[in-house]
């Protein structure tokens, strides 16, 4: 293995609390807007966090977007109910807040803008004038918190039914089903809900037809096999040509972020597996790393390599399903059955190590659940001998097929500018020629010590390029796994830290305070320091991140989960307008998404 650490991770510990006043962007902002225009918040997010006035928000955003090395991507946007937060020393007074997370690819740096709001004046201007992908994020922010977005093109519910009442992520909104009245579906309510699902083109600025002909409006989903889940797209058609479309999401929404406010730091780990249910341990990684930043925990090299190994196994598992179902969407059936044979080998290996298959919930705050079992290396070696030859056969028999290439090359194509505008990450972004893989540019869990390449496209991201990049990513994951096999360090599988590891039994028998603390941490969960932390990872479908806010409790005050698929589905209309319905099926297969990752 080789060292490839970038300069992004400063020499400070990953969990240090910093205000990032030395970041060049802070100086640029102060030179433009004055030294006292902002409040800079010290956090453990690893990025500058700047509170701006609502009246300056768009001006500051436009300034950042036009810098010599601009902040070109709106990575995330959401809100927080600050009313019950007790640890706010030095922060602007706020009942609610909205944050805007921007990324500069050229700088390889981020900045987070925050706006403080009072309860009797909940409004911010729409950010869609600067970043079109703010649309869905702002709809969700309004829906979950009741924060009005002034100038938004279509401010309506996105996750919840149109008939829903209330704003679920407010602190005064119930978090458990038992806090609601029993649900009853009367005939009148059923009729009301069905009427709410009726699509009205005028609500979306669509015409029902031209002077000479009417458009057809067609529902694709929410139960269509090519929709890859409970996902509905309303198509405006002129013959078979897609004039426009409206993606309709939320059918799989489970309230994952609300659950984070009612689970202990430890007991929330199983929920992370269900965010993107194919990713397994990959989903656990950003959460446990973010909590470890809050706690100030550093894990052993062995833990880092074990985590990387499990993550890459699940990456291969997810990519195999993606590639085979893409081929199936184009029209070839056989490869998907071969792929499930290969995925079974991965599940056998994962089960031997963790005891579970799809949702191991195996990573722990400060380590992993238990050490590697005897014989793990033999199972991994057998898989590494098997998989490369199978991958070659997929490529030769199906992916180089003339018909498949003809159906996917040039379909749903977009360039780097559009990818950045819509918050596209993962293979969809790299296919445009932008070399941005978090494992390389912002290494975590020891990825800087592995020798692997990042596949990058030639400038245009189309369906075929995206799937071929995933094939090469599979090969790179196999390289990483080989290095895990050859270089597994010795050492503990759990950090010796009071917030994660029980004390020695003999000490609990002699010191009552130690026993009391142990009892409280096991029964109620550990208390994390009051701070904010953030961690992004290169997940199976793009960049996944957790932004955690602790108020010095056994539970998270706010758990924000940013998933790649949410951004990718918002991009669908811009990429598919003018194409045929058959092209849409190929495009959906090339995105690589599951609806749990979209809806959370």
Curated annotation (Swiss-Prot):
Assembly behavior: NDH-1 is composed of 13 different subunits. Subunits NuoB, CD, E, F, and G constitute the peripheral sector of the complex.
GO MF assignments: NAD binding; NADH dehydrogenase (ubiquinone) activity; NADH:ubiquinone reductase (non-electrogenic) activity; quinone binding
Annotated region described as NADH dehydrogenase I subunit D, given as residue ranges: 214-600
Keywords carried by this UniProt record: Cell inner membrane, Cell membrane, Membrane, Multifunctional enzyme, NAD, Quinone, Translocase, Transport, Ubiquinone
GO CC terms in record: NADH dehydrogenase complex; plasma membrane
EC number(s) on file: 7.1.1.-
Protein's job: NDH-1 shuttles electrons from NADH, via FMN and iron-sulfur (Fe-S) centers, to quinones in the respiratory chain. The immediate electron acceptor for the enzyme in this species is believed to be ubiquinone. Couples the redox reaction to proton translocation (for every two electrons transferred, four hydrogen ions are translocated across the cytoplasmic membrane), and thus conserves the redox energy in a proton gradient.
Lineage, highest ranks first: Bacteria, Pseudomonadati, Pseudomonadota, Gammaproteobacteria, Enterobacterales
Region (NADH dehydrogenase I subunit C): 1-190
Name under which the protein is recorded: NADH-quinone oxidoreductase subunit C/D
Family statement drawn from the similarity comment of this UniProt entry: In the N-terminal section; belongs to the complex I 30 kDa subunit family.
UniProt topology in membrane: Peripheral membrane protein
Enzyme kind, highest EC tier: translocase
Subcellular location(s) per record: Cell inner membrane
Signal peptide bounds: none
Organism: Salmonella paratyphi C (strain RKS4594)
């Amino acid at each position: 293995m080789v060292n490839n650490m970038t300069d992004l991770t400063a020499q400070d510990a990953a969990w240090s609390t910093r205000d990032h006043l030395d970041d060049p962007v802070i100086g640029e902002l102060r030179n433009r807007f004055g030294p006292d225009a902002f409040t800079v918040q010290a956090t453990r997010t690893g990025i500058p966090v700047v509170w701006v006035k609502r009246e300056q928000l768009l001006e500051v955003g436009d300034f950042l977007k036009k810098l010599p090395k601009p902040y070109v991507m709106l990575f995330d946007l959401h809100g927080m109910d600050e009313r019950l937060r007790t640890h706010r020393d030095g922060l602007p007074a706020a009942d609610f807040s909205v944050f805007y997370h921007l990324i500069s690819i050229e700088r390889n740096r981020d900045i987070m803008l925050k706006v403080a709001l009072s309860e009797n004046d909940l409004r911010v201007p729409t950010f869609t004038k600067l970043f079109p992908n703010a649309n869905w994020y702002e709809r969700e922010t309004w829906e979950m918190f009741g924060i009005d977005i002034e100038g938004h093109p279509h401010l309506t519910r996105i996750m919840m039914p149109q008939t829903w009442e209330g704003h679920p992520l407010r602190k005064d909104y119930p978090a458990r089903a038992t806090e609601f009245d029993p649900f009853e579906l009367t005939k009148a309510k059923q009729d009301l809900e069905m009427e709410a699902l009726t699509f009205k083109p005028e609500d979306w600025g669509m015409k029902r037809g031209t002077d000479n002909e009417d458009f057809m409006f067609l529902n694709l989903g929410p139960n269509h096999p090519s929709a890859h889940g409970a996902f509905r797209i309303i198509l405006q058609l002129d013959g078979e040509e897609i004039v426009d479309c409206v993606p309709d999401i939320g059918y799989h929404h489970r309230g994952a972020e609300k659950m984070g406010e009612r689970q202990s730091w430890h007991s929330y780990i199983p929920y992370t597996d269900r965010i993107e249910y194919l990713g397994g341990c990959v989903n656990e990684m950003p959460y446990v790393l973010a909590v470890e930043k809050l706690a100030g925990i550093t894990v052993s090299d062995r833990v880092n390599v074990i985590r990387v190994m499990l993550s890459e196994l699940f990456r291969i598992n997810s990519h195999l399903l993606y590639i085979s179902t893409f081929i199936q969407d184009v029209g070839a059936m056989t490869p998907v059955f071969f792929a499930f044979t290969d995925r079974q080998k991965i599940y056998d290996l994962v089960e031997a190590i963790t005891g579970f298959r799809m949702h191991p919930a195996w990573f722990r705050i400060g380590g992993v659940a238990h050490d590697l079992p005897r014989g793990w290396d033999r199972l991994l070696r057998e898989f590494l001998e098997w998989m490369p030859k199978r991958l070659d056969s997929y490529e030769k028999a199906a992916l180089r097929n003339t018909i498949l290439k003809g159906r996917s090359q040039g379909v749903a194509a977009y360039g780097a500018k559009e990818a950045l505008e819509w918050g596209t990450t993962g293979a969809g972004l790299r296919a445009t020629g932008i070399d941005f893989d978090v494992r390389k540019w912002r290494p975590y869990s020891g990825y800087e010590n592995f020798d692997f390449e990042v596949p990058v496209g030639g400038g245009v991201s189309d369906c075929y390029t995206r799937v071929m990049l995933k094939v090469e990513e599979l090969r790179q994951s196999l390289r990483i796994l080989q290095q895990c096999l050859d270089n597994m360090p010795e050492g503990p599988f759990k950090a010796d830290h009071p917030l994660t590891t029980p004390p020695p039994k003999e000490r609990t028998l002699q010191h009552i305070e130690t026993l009391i603390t142990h009892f409280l941490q096991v029964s109620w969960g550990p208390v994390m320091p009051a701070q904010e932390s953030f961690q992004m990872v290169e997940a199976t479908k793009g960049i996944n991140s957790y932004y955690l806010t602790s108020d010095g409790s056994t539970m998270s005050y706010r758990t924000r989960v940013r998933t790649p698929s949410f951004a990718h589905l918002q991009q669908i209309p811009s990429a598919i307008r003018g194409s045929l319905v058959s092209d849409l099926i190929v495009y959906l297969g090339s995105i690589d998404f599951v609806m749990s990752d979209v809806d959370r």
